[in-house]
Swiss-Prot record:
UniProt cross-references to NCBIfam families, sorted A to Z: purC
Cellular component GO terms, alphabetical: cytosol
Species annotation: Rhizorhabdus wittichii (strain DSM 6014 / CCUG 31198 / JCM 15750 / NBRC 105917 / EY 4224 / RW1)
Gene assigned in the entry: purC
CDD domains reported in the protein's UniProt record: SAICAR_synt_PurC
One of the GO BP terms on file: 'de novo' IMP biosynthetic process
Record-given protein name: Phosphoribosylaminoimidazole-succinocarboxamide synthase
Organismal lineage: Bacteria, Pseudomonadati, Pseudomonadota, Alphaproteobacteria, Sphingomonadales
Length: 258
């Protein structure tokens, strides 16, 4: 396999230069972090599962007209994506009280919110990704008013679609994180959905039992992280019973010439 130049390495993914201008290869790692990387670990096979799950959701979002950076999955751990300029804002969509919302406002975990809440966080690990308002985003030029309108509109569309998708397989979509990027076409840019959608960035609870099937199992030392991610993939029809999607991280990276 041709050795590709590494562009960037984050907590959960690595970006390599793509085969064509304007493309990148997104590689999913098994590394797990929580609390702004204060807690670190490994979930064996997480990258394989997240690659499949994110591919599935991004592909389905594309069919309803949500523009994304996803082009196609290349192998078990990699997908080809459009190169974008990431907007430095994490968008969190909340349907049910959980996580930091319960701590900030003293709301009991699991409380159904009267309406969906969209929150914005400035992407800066050193600052702990602080929560910001629209006024901060406009003041510091992180995104234009038109871009924020498009981002909010896409976030609601993604939420509506995913709530139905997961409800259909017996899963409650509690909240999730989205990232967006500017896709440039000559001098014109538009905002499209980027990063990934997987159990790493979603809170997913079994509707019948309330069992957590996401990265909270790692955050809260509940154990069974691999089984939870596999259960999401299985219910989405991506992992037939008996199929083993786990792939050793180091051997795969050696094979690709890293």
């Amino acid at each position: 396999m041709t050795r590709r130049r590494q562009i960037y390495e984050g907590k959960a993914k690595i970006l390599y230069e793509g085969p064509e201008p304007g493309t990148l290869i997104q590689y999913f790692k098994d590394d797990a972090t929580a609390f702004n990387a204060q807690k670190k670990g490994t979930i064996n096979g997480k990258g394989v599962l997240n690659n499949r799950i994110s591919e599935h959701i991004f592909t389905m979002l594309g069919t309803i007209g949500v523009a994304t950076h996803f082009i196609r999955r290349l192998n078990m751990r990699e997908q080809l994506i459009r190169q974008v300029e990431i907007v430095p804002i994490e968008v969190v969509v909340r349907n049910v009280a959980a996580g930091s919302l319960t701590k900030r406002l003293g709301i009991e975990e699991g409380t159904q919110l009267p309406r969906t809440i969209i929150e914005y966080y400035y992407k800066d690990d050193a600052l702990g990704d602080p929560m910001v308002a629209d006024e901060h985003i406009a003041c510091f030029g992180w995104a234009s008013q038109e871009e924020m309108h498009d981002i909010a509109d896409m976030a609601i569309r993604v939420n509506d679609f995913m709530c139905g998708l997961f409800a259909g397989i017996g899963i409650r979509l509690v909240d999730f994180k989205l990232e967006f990027g500017r896709f440039w076409d000559n001098d014109y840019s538009r905002v499209i959905l980027a990063d990934e959608i997987s159990p790493d960035g979603c809170r997913l609870w079994d509707m019948a039992t309330g069992e957590k099937l996401d990265k909270d199992r790692f955050r809260q030392d509940l154990g069974g992280e691999v089984e939870a991610y596999q259960e999401i993939a299985r219910r989405l029809g991506l992992m037939p019973d008996g199929e083993n999607m786990i792939l050793d991280l180091e051997s795969h990276r050696k094979n690709r010439g890293k």
